[in-house]
């Protein structure tokens, strides 16, 4: 095998030596392609696995942790929630519509492959500077393309997109982030797994035909961008949501039978990863007759068929004798379904082309024992330069308040979420635009499931460990503010080039923060994804671990809103304000800097706040609640009253006026009626949570916080209309 071919497959000299040892010979081109895909960063996690191993993954309510298509938790009365968040960053930067659409398609398949009907989607989107003279116009194009792709696929599938977050920073000018989350519901006894066992059991290909789209996608997602990346459009998969809808319905019909052993969707690396993962998890072997694969294009080769990432495809291991019944179901839904192989006990993948053996590869070394890299790490030099920076107010508090409320990182994103159907399936209680976590009702058992997606990249730049821990805490706090109990998380770890020791240090620190927070807050990791090489021309993104927290509220009718719907409600700030300005939004807007330091998270205070919110809501003491996030209590209150029908007369009580922009963790704003105040304050003392009365909601259409005064119409205009103007 010549060196240029090996290099083109992103195989290192050490890895090639390992391949020779595994095979006992030189690989052919097909085998090299298969191994390079399975050992790519995207599929093997070779740079990240050593840091992920310590994640807490178990709890009494966890049914399935990491290692399957999605995580599964018990939500009561024999029902389970199945969920995962995943990235489609590189394809979405190259071709925003198709990249984002297929990102949604992929995550939906991960969930319904487990036997669940998908009932909700979220997304976390990061774009570059839309005001930048050089790239601002292109960033707006990316925003519109990505949003259009997500809405097209989700809406066509009949899956409500009920929430998300969207942020802008120049660190994303060369690499945007598109993280998609899906959650499904099924009976706990009806979960399906990705396994292929039982010698002689047929392996069935179902779904759309295979084309040349997406070739090399897993390898492409394991590299950084440069000038040549513009030629990568052919590696972006093309999605067809109508085919996926048929595939989902066919699978859900199949799951009602006992015809199959296991099922796996064909995602990154296509037929290669699905076949190797199913056989690898089961300790089996497999024969695949590649010429039987349904093909969309003529003249396709075994190499192309194994590595194509054409969408809307699944691999099924059926029980012997039931293959015709399986095929009949998929034919009924107008989908291809063909037996293309069988399970063996050889622990090898045998690839045939018109009855000729064209590839023979041991399965375990590829699926279970990919190389684990021990990359060098070093603390970034910039940290010592930024840590001592202190924020001081330089402009009028009113001017700064107005600047912040209309900033694209804070203002309302109706331009985005209005394109998503949030009410299809009629389960949605709280959707995008209503602040905080999103909530759906589970009709089968009367509970509600709350979910929140969170990632503050600036905090992770300032301190990668504490920043990651804060993401776990913040996502959980948003869930707690609906009245639900946070139970588990899914993570999507977006970082720069792992070949840079400073990036690997950021990643290692981020994993430590997640481990610590999940352990202390008792929200285990049940699924996740790693996206590295988010770098262009040597410039990496800020560390961006996206966390989705999922929780359950036993009575869906008790779901808390984030808006004040009545006058004369008492407004309280819960938790301590510690003067946290490191990586804050107010510093970014006023000083154009991302600097400072972060205090360690007080997990006892965080948990006490969650428990207080849960108990107070169970006792029907609260009218509304919202987590304090970016922009501090100033922006949290402004947004809550912008989506409310009443005004506000509030006094922070801070001696230093800039403290209204402090971003300390473990805080929430709540509203309650005056007759419940005494009982509530007794409860706050019981849980050890400080409560500060800020004022009341009023009938006057006016917003007042300390010296800041706006009429309600001005407040609403700043919050609701500014993004529409910025994105045009």
From Swiss-Prot:
Subcellular location: Cytoplasm
Pfam family, one: AIRS_C
Function: Part of the phosphoribosylformylglycinamidine synthase complex involved in the purines biosynthetic pathway. Catalyzes the ATP-dependent conversion of formylglycinamide ribonucleotide (FGAR) and glutamine to yield formylglycinamidine ribonucleotide (FGAM) and glutamate. The FGAM synthase complex is composed of three subunits. PurQ produces an ammonia molecule by converting glutamine to glutamate. PurL transfers the ammonia molecule to FGAR to form FGAM in an ATP-dependent manner.
Organism listed in the record: Campylobacter jejuni subsp. doylei (strain ATCC BAA-1458 / RM4099 / 269.97)
Binding site for ATP: 45, 84, 491, 528
Catalysed reactions listed for this entry: N(2)-formyl-N(1)-(5-phospho-beta-D-ribosyl)glycinamide + L-glutamine + ATP + H2O = 2-formamido-N(1)-(5-O-phospho-beta-D-ribosyl)acetamidine + L-glutamate + ADP + phosphate + H(+)
EC id: 6.3.5.3
Protein name listed in UniProt: Phosphoribosylformylglycinamidine synthase subunit PurL
InterPro entries, A to Z: PRibForGlyAmidine_synth_PurL (IPR010074), PurL_linker (IPR041609), PurM-like_C_dom (IPR010918), PurM-like_C_sf (IPR036676), PurM-like_N (IPR016188), PurM-like_N_sf (IPR036921)
PANTHER family tied to this protein: PHOSPHORIBOSYLFORMYLGLYCINAMIDINE SYNTHASE SUBUNIT PURL
Domain of life of the native organism: Bacteria
Listed Gene3D superfamilies: PurM-like C-terminal domain, PurM-like, N-terminal domain
GO biological process, one term: 'de novo' IMP biosynthetic process
């Amino acid at each position: 095998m010549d060196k240029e071919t090996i290099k083109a497959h992103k195989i290192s000299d050490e890895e090639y030596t390992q391949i020779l040892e595994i095979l006992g010979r030189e690989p052919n081109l097909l085998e090299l392609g298969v191994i390079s895909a399975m050992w790519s960063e995207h599929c093997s996690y070779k740079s990240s696995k050593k840091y992920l191993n310590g994640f807490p993954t178990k709890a009494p309510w966890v049914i399935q942790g990491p290692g399957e298509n999605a995580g599964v938790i018990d939500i009561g009365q024999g029902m389970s929630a199945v969920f995962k968040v995943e990235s489609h960053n590189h394809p979405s930067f190259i071709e925003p519509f198709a990249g984002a659409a297929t990102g949604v398609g992929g995550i939906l398949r991960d969930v319904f492959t487990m036997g669940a009907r998908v009932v909700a989607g979220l997304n976390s989107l990061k774009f570059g500077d839309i005001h930048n003279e050089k790239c601002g116009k292109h960033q707006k194009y990316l925003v519109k393309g990505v949003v259009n792709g997500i809405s097209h696929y989700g809406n066509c599938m009949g899956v409500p997109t009920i929430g998300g977050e969207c942020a802008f920073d120049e660190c994303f000018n060369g690499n945007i982030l598109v993280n998609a989350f899906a959650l499904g519901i099924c009976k706990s006894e009806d979960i399906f797994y990705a396994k292929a066992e039982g010698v002689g059991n047929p392996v069935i290909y179902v779904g759309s035909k295979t084309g040349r789209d997406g070739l090399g996608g897993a390898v492409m997602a394991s590299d950084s961008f440069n000038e040549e990346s513009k030629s990568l459009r052919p590696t972006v998969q093309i999605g067809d949501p109508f085919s996926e809808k048929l595939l989902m319905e066919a699978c859900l019909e199949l799951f009602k039978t006992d015809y199959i052993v296991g099922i796996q969707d064909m995602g990154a690396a296509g037929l290669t990863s699905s076949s190797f993962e199913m056989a690898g998890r089961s300790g089996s072997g497999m024969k695949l007759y590649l010429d039987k694969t349904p093909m969309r294009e003529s003249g396709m080769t075994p190499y192309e068929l194994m590595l194509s990432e054409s969408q809307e495809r699944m691999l099924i291991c059926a029980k012997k004798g039931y293959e015709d019944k399986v095929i009949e179901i998929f034919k009924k839904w107008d989908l291809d379904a063909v037996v293309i192989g069988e399970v063996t006990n050889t622990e090898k993948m045998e690839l045939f082309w018109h009855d000729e053996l064209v590839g023979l590869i041991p399965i375990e070394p590829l699926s279970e024992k990919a190389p684990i890299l021990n990359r060098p790490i070093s603390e970034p030099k910039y940290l010592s330069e930024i840590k001592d920076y202190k924020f001081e107010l330089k402009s009028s508090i009113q001017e700064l308040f107005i600047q912040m409320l209309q900033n694209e990182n804070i203002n309302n994103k109706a331009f985005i979420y209005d394109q998503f159907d949030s009410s299809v399936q009629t389960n949605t209680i709280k959707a995008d635009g209503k602040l905080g976590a999103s909530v759906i009702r589970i009709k089968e058992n009367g509970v509600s499931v709350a979910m929140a997606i969170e990632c503050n990249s600036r905090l992770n730049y300032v301190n990668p460990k504490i920043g990651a821990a804060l993401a776990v805490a913040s996502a959980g706090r948003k869930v707690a503010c609906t009245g639900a109990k946070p139970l588990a998380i899914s993570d999507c770890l977006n970082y720069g080039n792992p070949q840079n020791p400073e990036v690997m240090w950021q990643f290692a620190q981020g994993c430590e923060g997640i481990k610590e927070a999940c352990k202390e807050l008792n929200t285990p990791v049940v699924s996740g994804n790693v996206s590295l090489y988010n770098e262009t021309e040597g410039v990496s993104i800020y560390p961006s671990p996206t966390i989705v927290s999922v929780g359950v509220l036993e009575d869906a009718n008790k779901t808390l809103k984030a808006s004040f719907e009545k006058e004369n409600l008492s407004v309280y700030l819960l938790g301590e304000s510690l003067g946290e300005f490191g990586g804050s939004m107010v510093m970014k807007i006023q000083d154009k800097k991302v600097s400072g330091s972060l205090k360690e998270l007080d997990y006892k205070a965080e948990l006490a706040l969650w428990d207080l919110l849960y108990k107070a809501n169970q006792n029907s003491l609260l009218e509304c609640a919202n987590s304090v996030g970016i922009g501090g209590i100033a922006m949290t209150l402004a947004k809550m009253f912008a989506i409310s029908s009443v005004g506000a007369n509030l006094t922070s009580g801070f001696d230093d006026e800039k403290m209204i922009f402090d971003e300390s963790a473990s805080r929430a704003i709540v509203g309650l009626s005056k007759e419940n105040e005494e009982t509530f304050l007794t409860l706050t003392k019981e849980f050890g949570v400080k409560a500060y009365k800020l004022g009341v909601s009023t009938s006057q259409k006016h917003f007042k916080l300390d010296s800041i005064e706006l009429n309600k119409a001005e407040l609403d205009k700043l919050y609701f209309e500014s993004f529409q103007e910025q994105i045009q």
